[in-house]
From Swiss-Prot:
Subcellular location: Secreted
Residues with the Alanine amide modification: 28
Protein name (database record): M-poneritoxin-Da4b
Primary site of residence: secreted
One cellular-component annotation, GO: extracellular region
Role: The synthetic peptide has antimicrobial activity against the Gram-positive bacteria B.amyloliquefacies S499 (MIC=0.05 mM), L.monocytogenes 2231 and S.aureus ATCC 29213, against the Gram-negative bacteria P.putida BTP1, P.aeruginosa PaO1 and E.coli ATCC 10536, and against the fungi S.cerevisiae, R.mucilaginosa and C.cucumerinum. It is not active against the fungi F.oxysporum and B.cinerea.
GO BP: defense response to bacterium; defense response to fungus; killing of cells of another organism
Highest rank taxon of the organism: Eukaryota
Region forming the signal peptide: none
Length: 28
């Protein structure tokens, strides 16, 4: 289910979100 998918991918997703957040802050 979704929870298994999230647990498998969450570390990568969190890294991507952090990178997008940094890029957004720099662009602002």
């Amino acid at each position: 289910g979704l929870k298994d998918w999230w647990n498998k991918h969450k570390d990568k997703i969190i890294d991507v979100v952090k990178e997008m957040g940094k890029a957004g802050l720099q662009a602002a």
